[in-house]
Amino acid sequence: MIVLEDIEVMARIGLLEEELYAPQDLTVSVEIEHSFDRISETDDLADGIDYREVIEFIREFCGAYDGKTIERLADLLCKSIKEKFPSERVHLVLNMPRYVNKLGLSAIRVEVEH
C-alpha cells in the first residue's frame, strides 16, 4: 500500500460567497492499495506508481475544482485517482482546516473509499 499524507492543495470550494472568492487551503491524504509484486522484482518505476505523479495529479485536480462541498470533491478525486492509477482500493481523507479554530474543533474532514 502506498500512503501519502497531508498533501497541501488549493481548491475553490464552499457555499458562502467569501469562500468562493479565493481558493482555500486543504490537505489530502491518500492510501493506494497496489501490488508491489512486479516493481519488487524489476526495481523499475514503470512497474509501479510514481508518488510524484500522484501528488501532481491531486494538486492539479483540486486546483481546477470549483464546487460547493468537500464531500463531492473527495468523492470525485478518489474515483479519479483510482481510474488514473490502477489499484485495488483508494482511501482518501480531505481536511478543511479553515474553520477549525472558528468552530472550536480539532478537525473538519471527510473520508471516502473506492
Regions found by a protein language model. Name each.
Residues M1-H114:
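N-terminal, polar/charged subdomain of small-to-medium soluble alpha/beta proteins
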